[in-house]
Structures are given as C-alpha cells and as structure tokens.
Amino acid sequence: MLDVNFFDELRIGLATAEDIRQWSYGEVKKPETINYRTLKPEKDGLFCEKIFGPTRDWECYCGKYKRVPFKGIICERCGVEVTRAKVRRERMGHIELAAPVTHIWYFKGVPSRLGYLLDLAPKDLEKIIYFAAYVITSVDEEMRHNELSTLEAEMAVERKAVEDQRDGELEARAQKLEADLAELEAEGAKADARRKVRDGGEREMRQIRDRAQRELDRLEDIWSTFTKLAPKQLIVDENLYRELVDRYGEYFTGAMGAESIQKLIENFDIDAEAESLRDVIRNGKGQKKLRALKRLKVVAAFQQSGNSPMGMVLDAVPVIPPELRPMVQLDGGRFATSDLNDLYRRVINRNNRLKRLIDLGAPEIIVNNEKRMLQESVDALFDNGRRGRPVTGPGNRPLKSLSDLLKGKQGRFRQNLLGKRVDYSGRSVIVVGPQLKLHQCGLPKLMALELFKPFVMKRLVDLNHAQNIKSAKRMVERQRPQVWDVLEEVIAEHPVLLNRAPTLHRLGIQAFEPMLVEGKAIQLHPLVCEAFNADFDGDQMAVHLPLSAEAQAEARILMLSSNNILSPASGRPLAMPRLDMVTGLYYLTTEVPGDTGEYQPASGDHPETGVYSSPAEAIMAADRGVLSVRAKIKVRLTQLRPPVEIEAELFGHSGWQPGDAWMAETTLGRVMFNELLPLGYPFVNKQMHKKVQAAIINDLAERYPMIVVAQTVDKLKDAGFYWATRSGVTVSMADVLVPPRKKEILDHYEERADKVEKQFQRGALNHDERNEALVEIWKEATDEVGQALREHYPDDNPIITIVDSGATGNFTQTRTLAGMKGLVTNPKGEFIPRPVKSSFREGLTVLEYFINTHGARKGLADTALRTADSGYLTRRLVDVSQDVIVREHDCQTERGIVVELAERAPDGTLIRDPYIETSAYARTLGTDAVDEAGNVIVERGQDLGDPEIDALLAAGITQVKVRSVLTCATSTGVCATCYGRSMATGKLVDIGEAVGIVAAQSIGEPGTQLTMRTFHQGGVGEDITGGLPRVQELFEARVPRGKAPIADVTGRVRLEDGERFYKITIVPDDGGEEVVYDKISKRQRLRVFKHEDGSERVLSDGDHVEVGQQLMEGSADPHEVLRVQGPREVQIHLVREVQEVYRAQGVSIHDKHIEVIVRQMLRRVTIIDSGSTEFLPGSLIDRAEFEAENRRVVAEGGEPAAGRPVLMGITKASLATDSWLSAASFQETTRVLTDAAINCRSDKLNGLKENVIIGKLIPAGTGINRYRNIAVQPTEEARAAAYTIPSYEDQYYSPDFGAATGAAVPLDDYGYSDYR
C-alpha cells in the first residue's frame, strides 16, 4: 500500500473546476451553519454532516445507525455515512457558482498574471471584471469583410436619411421665419421686435443642425468602431455597445465580468502567442522587448507546465473541511466562529440571490450588479483587503481570509509547520549547580516524575509493584515511596535536553544527564552559562525529553554538553572558567613577596628555608599554618612535567618521563593549579589571568581528546570556586578609594578650559573648534585622574583583583566609581563638552546626573531595536543558507583561495598575521606547503591546526593556498574537504552536517552585540555606516551609503580639483579609452593607500592605481566590484568587509561561515543569450543547472547559453530558491505561491525547511539518505552458521546467497521432529 507520508517531491498547480468538483463530497447550498436549538449542523449548510461526515464517531445524523458494526453504511434517512468524526478534518465541499469569477491572486498580484497572459492592462482588466466596461471576445472577421460594402451602403442610406430630414426641417423653418418677418413688417413693428424673432428662428435652426450633426457623429462613431472592432477591445460606453449589438450583433460577441475573461482564455492560443513573443524578443528593441520578455515568462509557464489557464477563472469554489474553520459554543450560549465561515456565508448568500434573479429573468443591470458582488465576496474569501476596503467583522476588524491564514508570523507556515509545541517538556527557573559535572544538570523530582511518567508506570508494572497500568498511574499520582526508587532507575543514562530562549545558536539547546534534586528549580552547570547566555537572576529554561533510542543516542553523542565545549563560530572553547572561578584561580596562582614561609637562600649560619621534597610536604606545612599557598618556595616535583625549555635543558632528547625529579621555584598555589591539568602538560609557572587560562584551555582543546578537556575544566571550576571562597574577595564602600590628588588635577584643567572659553567669547574660536578643544582637554583630565587612581590603589584591593584577573569589569568602570565619570555623549553620539567631574562614590550633581541619563537612555532604546534587527538578520541568513549541507567527502577541485599567514618585515623577520585565527586556521591545505629548500612542511589535504600553522611560520612560509567553500565544485551543498574542519568538533566536518545553518547562527548570534549607530568620521564627513546596518547592507548587496568609486582599469590618475567636486580621470596603461569619474563630492575625501615607493599617503595627481582600487574614502559598491573584478574578488571583498564590522566589536567568527553565505549570494547566473537552451533571456538560473544544461546542449551540437554572474541580496536569494515551500514560508507568501502554481513548480525537498514543513526527517545529520538506507550485511560467522542448518535437497537453497540478499541467519533453534 502507498504510504501518504512517503514521497519525494511536492508539486503545486492550478485547480480547474473539474478538480474542485472531484475533491468535493457535496455541494454546500445554504449559508446556515448549525441549528441554534439542537446545536446540530443544518442540512446542505456549511457544517452539513451529509457532505463532511458525522460529528460523532460511528453515528449518523438522525441516530438510526450507532456504533462500529455499521461502519461504511450510508443512512437512507439522513444520507450521512457512518464513519469516524475525524473525516470532518479532511472532506471538502464546494459551491457551484451561478456566474464564473476570477481568482484575485492571478488578477491582482504584481505583476498581474492574467493581464500578462491576455495582454491587457490591469486597469482595463479591473473594469471588465467589475462590470465597468464591455470587452469584445470574438469577431467574425470573414463575414464582416464579405458584407462590408453592403453594410457601408446601408450606413450611407441611413446618413442620407438623416441629412435629408435635416435639410427639410431647415427649409421649412426658414420659410416660416420669412413669413413671420413679412407679417411683422406689415404691422410696422419696431426693429428690435423683428430682431428678436430673427434671433429665435436662427437659434432653432442651429439646434436642428446640431441635433443632426450629433446623430451623424454617432453613426460615424458606431461605423468606425465596428470596422475596427477586434478581440480584447474595451468599450466603456454602454449606449455605444448596445447600438453595436442591435445593428451588428451577428458579427461579434462581447460581454463583461469574469465570463468575458473566461471566453478570452478559451480562445487564447498559447503556442502561437509564445512563438510570436519569442519573435519579438529576437528582433525587438527597448520597451517592446522588455514587455515581451515579461509576458513570455507567464505564457511559457503555462505552455511548459501543462497547466490550463482556465484555472484562473473559477466556476466552483472549494469549501475547506469544517474542522479547519470550527464553530465553538462559549459559556453564555454565544458562539465563536472562524472568520472563514462569515466569508463563505457571504459567497453563498450572494450566489443564491444571483441564481434566483437569473431564474426570475431580472433586468441585466440588476444581474450584473449581483455578479459583481459575488466576484467581490469570492475575492474577500481568498484574499481580504487585496482590492478595495476589506470586509470587516464586529468591531471593524478585517476578517481573516484564506491568504491571511498562511501569511506572516501567525500564519500556518511559521506558527504551526515550522515551529510546533511538543509534549514531554517542562520549564522552570534555573539556579546554579556548582557540584554538578559538566555533563549533568539538576532536575526537580516533581518535574522528572511528570516527564518520565510513562516510563515509571511501565517499570512499576514490570517490577510487580502494580498489577496494571491503571494502578501504576494511580501510584505515580499519589507519589508512593516505591515510585521514587523506580524514577531513579528510569532516569539513569536517559539524557534530557535543556533549552534557553532565545536560541540564537546551536549551543542554545544541549543535552545533560539528569540528577534528581529537591526543590522546584533546575540546576545548571556554571560552565555552560556562557553558551546559553544564561545568568541566575530569574532566567527560565525548558526541558525536553528525547524518547526513541535514536533520539537518545544522538542527544548523548552529539548534543551532550561535554561534547560541545568549542564555539561553532570560532572553534575556540566556550566552556571557560569565568567570574568567581577566574578570581579564585588568579588568587591561587598569585605570588606574594614576603608571605609566610617564603623561600630564603642560605646566608651565613642560616640554612636555606622554604624548600620542600614534595608537594605533599608543602601541603602539610600549609595545613600547619607555617606556609602560605601564595609564598615563593622551592619544591621537588616528580609527577608534573617541567616547562619546555627546562625539559630540554635537564632531560635532553629523551625527554621527561613520569617519576623524573626536578626542582621548581614556584608557589604551592601554582603547584596545586598544575595538578588540575592533564598528566604530561608542561608546568605553567605564572599568574593565572583570564587570558592565560583561556590560552591553556585552547591548547588543551587542540591537543587532547574532548573528554580530557571536559574533565579538566570541571576540575578548574571546582578549584576556582574553592579558592574564590578562601580569598574572601568582596567589595564594600571602604574599598572604593578616591585619589587625594583629584582636586588639584581638575583645578589645573579647569584653568585650561577657562582659557578656551575666553578665546571663544573673543571670537578667536568658532563653536566647533571650541567644542573640540574642550573635549580634548577633558579627555586628558579624565586619563590623568585614572592614572592617579591606579597609583593610589594597593594591589590587593578587591576591586583591582576583580578587574586585573579579567573576571569582570574594566578599569574605566573603576575610574567611574572612584575617580570621575568624564565626558558623556548625547543621543547623536557626540561628546557633551561639560564633563561629569564627580565619581559615583562621591555622588553626582543634579546637572551631571541629567546629562548622564541622556546617553544612557539612548543606549537602552538602541539595545531593544538592535535585538529585533539582529533576530531578523539571523532569520534571513538561515533562510538563504538552509540547504547548504555537506553532501560529499571531496569534490576533487584544484581551486582554492590564498590566505596570508604572515608578513615579512623590512628586517626579514615574520610578523604573524593578526587574523590567522579566522582565515587560515581550521582549513584544509589545497597544495603542498613547501619551504625555500623544497621540503614539504605540510602536505596537501591536511588540516591546518595551531601546530601546523606554527610549523609553517617556523619554515618561513608567508602564504598558503587553502580549500574554500567559495571554490567548491559540489553542485548542491558543499563537500567536506572544501569546508574543512567543523569548528564545533575540531575534526573534519561530517557528511550531512548542516553547515549553512551553523554559518547563519554564527553570524547572527553576535548580531545583538553590534552597535546600531552609523558613526561619524571626522566632523562633517559622509556618514560611514557601521555595526549591524553595515552587515545588513553587505548581505543584502545594497549600494552602500557614501559609495566610493573604484578604478575600472590599471593606469595613471589625473586629478582635477574643482570648487566642491573632484574630477578623476584614469589613463589606462594599455592605451585604452580614458575612464572619467565626474562630480565626486569633496566631503568624501580621497583615499589613503600604499604607493609604489612604499609610502602611505593620499591619492594625488599622477599616482598609479591598480584595477579595482578604491579612489575615495567610504565603501565600494559590491556590484561594481563584481563588474570590474569578477566573482572571486567580490566574494573576498564581502567576506573582508563583514569581518571588519565584527572585528571592530571584538567578535571572532571564522571566515568560512561568511563564505557559505556569500557563496549563496552568488549562486545564480542571469541569462543574456539563451542559445539553443530553454532558458529565457533575463531569467535567473542556478549556476550548476546552467553549466549542466550548457554541457548537454553542446554535446548535442547546439549553441550554449551565455550568462553573467549576478550578486543577489540574501532576501532576494531566499525568495529565488528552487523550493517553493521554503520561499513561501519566508516572505511574500501569496506571491510565491501564485508564481509556483502558474509554473506548476515541483519541490524536490532538498533543503531542511521544506522537510520540516511536511514533517519528514530533515536531510541533514543522521537524516541524510546515506545514513537512512542501511542494510545489515552478515558477518562470515553468521554466514557459516547459516549453512549449518541440516540441509535438504539442493533445490531449497541456492548455494550462494550473494552480497545483495545477505545470508539467512537462524534466529531460534528449529525443532525438526515434525519432519521425521
């Protein structure tokens, strides 16, 4: 049987009226929903049981048949099938419309698909559909041509008749006038009386002429309209149309409303139209060609997909199942209903009224009005508010239509398909659990009991504590004593997942082994707080339970916290000692001169003191109080490895072995610290600042297995907390010391500030200069107070200990507390020239407090905005990169990128590249790295870790070629070798790893730390965008603010300095055409760069520039970089620019993550010439598809298509993805679905999102095909065992089982007695 959940692709298309009737289980004829008295559905109404199925399981409407035995019977009284009530979730109905209507998506979308197909302007289309104009649907050209002369003669006769009548009337009137005048003259009337009569007569004659002329014009209009009549012609004048129908009705047909559109589509020849459009594209120019291209996209979509365009005009409307638009009774007898029911009711009401009017033979104008209203009600049902005012419900709220159910964050896609609520989960407040191991978490007993309830119940039955599941459930609910023992047993080895929202990167969900704890709070290991970004001020976390064996295995192996020590963004450890732990280890390893029991060399008759034969002896002395752990001593060590240089000196080539003794001059604290490190790690004899601790853990992560690192950080945590407690570091008011010299320092600077103020008042300085001078003065003052403060504080001051150890805070904060706050900024980011002279210890004056709050509030507002922006950036990044999955081991490409390892200084020494951590580190080498003598230092295909990089630098190699995602040749996704080491595991990335999502999270997660503001460089200069807006600008491939021109060619610069503008001309070296950059604003300033002679200075006249070099300050436009230097350069440019923003904030992200995103931005090619391929010019095609199609066409002897690479922003690239499901769930849902339906798009379900939406395993990690399709191959022993079955005749078993089938392995002993 076919499994409905097992399919390889999902196609979307246009439904015709036939399809809609096929899906339907019956026609909904009445607008009624349910009977308010019986609360049962009305027959033929929107909830009808006959159509949609029974409301109660196995029970018909009238109650004749009840219960399962009657399954499948259709009741002859009420017509309801006896079946499960859940069919009401899947059975559809339909409404037969009395007049066709158009589908608003296809008529109103931008661009209007109906308009493009029929070549009608959307305005005209609207007039036709909403009964404001008639359209000619067909003209019998032949008949009109044959009878044209007869008709013309008839028309001539008619005109002649009108003219004759006019002439007759004029003549009669003229005669009457003559007679009247003669009569007046005879009476001897006055002249003005005669003039009045004459004027009146002439006026009447003029009216006769005008009337006749109007009639002649009308006839002329009718005739000319008729002779030029063509299909798709609009006639807005109703009288004109009526005349045409009366006179020439047999020569043409016309109509208004959706019926006319339906007729036009029926008569539309898609193939002929496509051919004529292709012809226009080949030979046309300008606007005409562009319009033809756009129309061809729509026409070709119908031509290729085999969709019938008739689907855009509906004769029947589907009614979705009633359970999806429920109606529920509230307390108080009122009903709450889905908006869809109201929208359907309007459609049915109007449809029934229209049917009645047609049956009654109502006048056309009334029928047309009703048809228009029907069209509007169907529009509102499909997409309310798309045209005109939206239909509103009670309280003027727009009703939610079918489109609104899909759109947006609350729509079906994002609310229910991409994120679901799950059972077996709970949440609670977190507290710190310092006694836990790294892989453990404390789970409250009550919560654990509820989570593991089914497991506990089953185990109770197994152990005979309970007779059946029901009594077991009762035991659990009453919390009997046996339950707790069973719970302990059940949770052992069963990991749980902990998650803290917001989950910004993959470490936001980790697996732990639960330990039962009293209380109601979850206990969290202190070292994982960094990864979760958790603190204990009331944060909550959610617990989830992996149920299946596979889920548990994945949680344990892949997600256990002790396996996730490294950051996926930088590959460096995240589980580091922090805060108290740092302080404790810093205290432990500090050396205090003159402390108790310090080593004293022998002098005179005093022997040397403070020398110990072993750490144990030293600890004994410390316990007796004669030695301080921080005093310098000499101690003989046998179990700790000496530092590298001492080891080389003492033990030579053979090296130190455990048990070899050596003397160390150190402190007991440092010996104790080193005993925490793994055996064989060289002795570290220095004070443990946070940076040193980080370096050690980094080194451990590079050289030791993860489990050793996890154990070590756990030991460091325990020691850190222990010694932090022992150190007694606390902060009180008495520790905040105000420097005594502060007043005199400030007085001195006050004088300088007064001088500047006076100069300003005299007019010697302008406002800006005065501000700059004051800012400079007060900056110096603040620094000097800080200096005085540092000198005044003793080294053992707790505040200084906390800051110096790197636990938290920095010296600026100490200065603010005890020295002076200094200058503060206003919301624009400019310094206010009055400093805050008080410290927080002394207290601020009212004015100081006020100006201080100014910038602080801006900071808070910024943070709120930044969080939302950063989340949206992450969402777009995930969307664009979600289908980048490692698909194969090696794509065998020879290409790669060159990265710098070091720079040669003028004296020949190597200066290590500061960005080596994010560029060369953790890459796969693309070619052998060879030194000057030709020795291979590191072979091709090796992973560059810290040891390899050190070896390369030692050999004097300054740059290497490494494999990169940018040059990977895998068609979908990337290969493992090009991606290199997985930052999170420290090993080569596994096939199936979703590196795209990891990349998006690594870039998005620190997004909140990036500043919002665009910072001002130098006074009035152009704003240079920085921080988050700059990252968005780069990833969206926008033209940057303050765009800087780049050199199109290599050549000499000619610089013309105008009044407000520069004009730069480049004279190319190859003698080509000169390139001129005109009107470059002087506010932008010329670029400073290295010249041929090695000096760094501003660009000036006569300088030599290379192609692609930036000429002005600011940012280059990536599209120009692509045009001038090609795709490879623009990729490197984007990676470099994004990294600059993150580095400015001190965030370390590996280049490879940014490369993954940039690769997606440059995935497409725009077709310039289609050659012999099916591609349309101007369309965007995936590069892999483009190359494959070209290879195919060339092999068949055709012309390949020509295309050029195009850089797309991440939003555009996400919407251009091949998967319509993924695009629709991202943004612009209705537009994506409209397009996909017309093209009859098929979703191959390659990415992650699409599979999440339809509820399949995602094709990443263990869900990838190569891991799912596994057959068990028997071992040789099993095969041999298979042959030991007593053999019958040969024909039963073929002698060879072959590799394909696998041998039959007996599972239990056969009893053969029956056969004998």
Swiss-Prot record:
InterPro entries: DNA-dir_RpoC_beta_prime, DNA-dir_RpoC_beta_prime_bact, RNA_pol_asu, RNA_pol_N, RNA_pol_Rpb1_1, RNA_pol_Rpb1_3, RNA_pol_Rpb1_3_sf, RNA_pol_Rpb1_4. Zn(2+) 2 binds at residues 891, 968, 975, 978. Mg(2+) binds at residues 535, 537, 539. CDD domains: RNAP_beta'_C, RNAP_beta'_N. Pfam families: RNA_pol_Rpb1_1, RNA_pol_Rpb1_2, RNA_pol_Rpb1_3, RNA_pol_Rpb1_4, RNA_pol_Rpb1_5. SUPFAM superfamilies: beta and beta-prime subunits of DNA dependent RNA-polymerase. It is an enzyme of class 2 (transferase). DNA-dependent RNA polymerase catalyzes the transcription of DNA into RNA using the four ribonucleoside triphosphates as substrates. Keywords: DNA-directed RNA polymerase, Magnesium, Metal-binding, Nucleotidyltransferase, Transcription, Transferase, Zinc. Gene3D superfamilies: 1.10.132.30, 1.10.150.390, 1.10.1790.20, 1.10.40.90, 2.40.40.20, 2.40.50.100, RNA polymerase II, clamp domain, RNA polymerase Rpb1, domain 3. The lineage of its organism: Bacteria, Bacillati, Actinomycetota, Actinomycetes, Mycobacteriales. GO terms for molecular function: DNA binding; DNA-directed RNA polymerase activity; magnesium ion binding; zinc ion binding. Its cofactor is Mg(2+); Zn(2+). This is DNA-directed RNA polymerase subunit beta'. HAMAP family: RNApol_bact_RpoC (MF_01322).
